[in-house]
UniProtKB/Swiss-Prot annotation:
It comes from the Archaea. Keywords: Ribonucleoprotein, Ribosomal protein. The gene is rpl21e. GO terms for molecular function: structural constituent of ribosome. One of its GO terms (biological process) is translation. Coiled coil: none annotated. Belongs to the eukaryotic ribosomal protein eL21 family. It comes from Picrophilus torridus (strain ATCC 700027 / DSM 9790 / JCM 10055 / NBRC 100828 / KAW 2/3). One of its GO terms (cellular component) is ribonucleoprotein complex. This is Large ribosomal subunit protein eL21. Residues 1-23 are annotated as: Disordered. The keyword Lipoprotein does not apply.
Length: 97
């Protein structure tokens, strides 16, 4: 019997799948979204774009934009008492009011 894969996308079948209507590449507007420091954003992974994709454990988490790193944004949030920072491309982020 073979060993189970332990890659960065393992165990993410439900998170990474899209519905039939949403399949394919995202629109250009979605790729070029802009955020300001202090904006609230949620991580919504778009599996069609592997660049700047955060780990699937962070799917659905909401945090505050604290800065930029290249063309990606740094999103900070707390898990328990631990402050976490995730670097994600704007395609994988959605503004929250």
């Amino acid at each position: 019997m073979t060993k189970m894969s332990k890659g960065p996308r393992s165990g993410s079948r439900r998170v990474m799948t899209k519905s039939v209507k949403n399949k394919g590449m995202p629109k250009v507007n979605e790729m070029m979204k802009t955020f300001e420091v202090g904006d609230r954003a949620a991580i919504v992974i778009n599996s069609a774009v592997p660049d700047g994709m955060p780990h699937h454990d962070f799917q659905g988490i909401t945090g505050v934009i604290t800065g930029m790193q290249g063309s990606c944004y740094i999103l900070s949030f707390k898990v328990g008492n631990v402050e976490k920072k995730v670097i994600a491309a704007p395609v994988h982020l959605r503004k929250v009011q």
